Each structure stands twice: as C-alpha cells, then as structure tokens.
C-alpha cells in the first residue's frame, strides 16, 4: 500500500545566495506529522511526498532591472536580502477575507470535541491499540436528549475475528457513553457506533493503519473542521482553512484564531455567548481589521467599548498567537 502526500503552495527556496533546503524541510515535516497522526503508517517505505511548490511572485509584480528595483511583490518569495521582506517594514493583510470565532461551546460541541479527544488520546490508544485514530462524530441535541453517532475504526491486524470486533464496538459505545455522562450531566444520551456495519456480510470498519485515508479518502485544507476542531452547522463560520498557511500575515489563519480568542475573552468577561467576525482588506495593516462584527446573546445592549478594547488587545497580541503556532501550542483543526 502506497500513500502520496501532495504539498502545494509558494515557498522561499533561497535568501539571496543562501539556499534553503525546502525539500528536506517538507519531507521532515510531513513524515513527522503523519507518523504521529497515523502511527501504523511506515512513513519511510509506504509514503511518497510530492512537493508542488513555487516561488512565483503575487499578482501585480512589476518587472524590470533587478539590481536597482526596490523591494516589492516581485521579490516576496525570492528575496535578494532581508530588505526584500515586506513584513519587516509593515505587517499587512495578504488577502481580503474573514475569520470567525464564538464562545462558549454548547453541549453537543463539548461532547463531540471531548469524545474524539478521549478516544484518540495517547493513553487511550496505548490501552486499546486496536482502535484507529480516524474517529468521526455527529452529535445532535434536542433539549435534554442528545444523539451521538460515532465512526470508530479498528485495526484489521489486531482484530482476530468477528466476535472480537463486535466486543470492541460495544466497548467503544460504553466508553463514549461514559465520557458523555461526565460532560453532559442531566442529559439523556444515546450512542450508535459504526452504523454502516453489516455483521452478516462482514462489511466492517476495519483498516490497516486506522484511517479511511487508506481506501481513497483525501484531506484538503479548508474542507472540514474549523480552527476549534468542529464543524458546527448552526454556528457562524467562514470557509477559511487554518492549516497550511503562513502564521506571519495570512489572515485566514490569524484572523480565525484571533476571532476565537476575542470571543472567548468577551464570554469570560460578560458570561454571555459571543460570536466575533474579523474582516480584513488586502494590503491593510494586519492589526487594524477593516470590519469587526460582534454578536451577543441576551436582551441587554452590548458594551461597544468593551468589544473594541478586547478586539484591540487581541489584535495587538498577534505575536503571541504566532509564537503559540510556531511552538505547536495552538491547535488549528
């Protein structure tokens, strides 16, 4: 079984005469990440990495004599020196887009995030290595009744027979019910696991490495979870993908995380549910959103001054978000 990882986008292959080994960097990053996410995948023997990268300038680059031409779009991804890096002079938005965040999570969201996190935690996988990591959940709440449908893969090489599979499927159901009881006390929760299984035909959710990616599923940035790890259909969201983007000035990444942080701070200060949208304008100062929209629960008025102060504080602290991203401390999916 051979897996292919396609890496697309623009990268800087050199700074002047100093060559940057982008191929090695890509290979190391992909193998490290997939090795962690899919521990049964042999990233040396069964993974082919195909970079499709460019250092082409952005639209609007002005061509001309290279030596005398000042820094601009032409040299954005092919800098002659540090002086060609526009972000050293001014941090600006790379695109016209929007980031959206909200707080707090509702019951269904807490369950979806908590159950998935529990089942895929290192401790859980160490205790139950026969479960895969590609866990998917749909959670619907109707008043105090909560319906959970889960897809929990099992590792074929560690599943000797149908009886073992059935017992572990039941075990997964019990684990989910237990986690749900702790996260949503007072709710009546029903749980279904691997509803597509046909035990008679032995069509089961068995995988070699613990993910449906091995049978043709693909993962594309922007298609799927938001920055908070969820796809909440009745919540405000943008279609911006957070993963795979530059943490320095890509608004699809920074504004999504900043909006989430602002919503969380506003909720903590007021106790009200908040949704925040930050809208950029291409070329505008990154710390100065073009538009800010805030929505709060309840009948009373929203303190506009409080919202402005919180958003200004978050935007002034973008360096903290960048540092957290580079340190791997902020989740992006």
Region roles according to the model:
Residues 28-184, 191-195:
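Glycine-rich, mobile lid/loop segments that gate access to catalytic sites or pores
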Residues 10-21, 25-36, 44, 241-243, ...:
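Small-residue-enriched alpha-helical segments and adjacent helix-cap loops
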Residues 21-29, 106, 110, 167-175, ...:
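Conserved active-site and cofactor/substrate-binding residues in soluble primary-metabolism enzymes
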Residues 271-333:
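Internal helix-turn-beta structural module
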Residues 240-285, 295-300:
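Hydrophobic alpha-helical bundle architecture
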Residues 142-146, 199-203, 285-291:
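A short, glycine/Asx- and small/polar-enriched loop/turn
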Residues 200-252:
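Long, contiguous, structured domain-core segments that constitute the functional module of a protein
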């Amino acid at each position: 079984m051979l897996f292919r990882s396609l890496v697309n986008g623009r990268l800087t292959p050199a700074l002047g005469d100093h060559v940057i080994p982008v191929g090695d960097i890509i290979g190391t990053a992909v193998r490290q990440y997939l090795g962690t996410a899919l521990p049964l995948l042999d990233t040396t023997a069964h993974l082919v990495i195909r970079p499709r990268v460019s250092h082409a300038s952005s639209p609007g680059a002005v061509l001309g004599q290279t030596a005398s031409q000042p820094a601009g779009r032409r040299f954005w991804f092919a800098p002659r020196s540090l002086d060609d890096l526009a972000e050293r002079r001014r941090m600006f938005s790379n695109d016209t887009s929007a980031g959206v965040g909200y707080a707090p999570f509702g019951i269904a969201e807490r369950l979806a995030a908590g159950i998935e996190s529990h089942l895929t935690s290192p401790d859980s996988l160490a205790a139950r290595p026969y479960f895969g990591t590609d866990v998917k959940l749909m959670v619907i709440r109707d008043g105090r009744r909560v319906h959970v449908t889960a897809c929990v893969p099992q590792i074929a090489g560690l599943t000797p027979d149908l009886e073992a599979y059935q017992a572990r499927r039941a075990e997964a159901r019990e684990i989910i019910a237990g986690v749900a009881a702790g996260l949503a006390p007072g709710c009546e929760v029903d749980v279904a696991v691997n509803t597509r299984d046909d035990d008679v035909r032995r069509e089961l959710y068995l995988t070699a490495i613990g993910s449906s990616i091995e049978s043709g599923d693909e993962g594309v940035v922007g298609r799927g979870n938001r920055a908070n790890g969820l796809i909440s259909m009745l919540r405000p969201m943008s279609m911006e993908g957070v993963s795979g983007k530059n943490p320095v000035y890509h608004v699809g990444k920074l504004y999504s995380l900043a909006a989430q942080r602002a919503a969380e701070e506003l909720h903590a200060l007021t106790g009200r549910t908040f949704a925040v949208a930050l809208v950029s304008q291409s070329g505008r100062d990154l710390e100065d959103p073009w538009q800010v929209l805030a929505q709060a629960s309840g009948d009373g008025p929203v303190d506009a001054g409080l919202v402005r102060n919180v958003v200004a504080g978050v935007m002034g602290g973008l360096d903290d978000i960048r540092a957290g991203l580079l340190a791997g401390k902020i989740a992006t999916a």
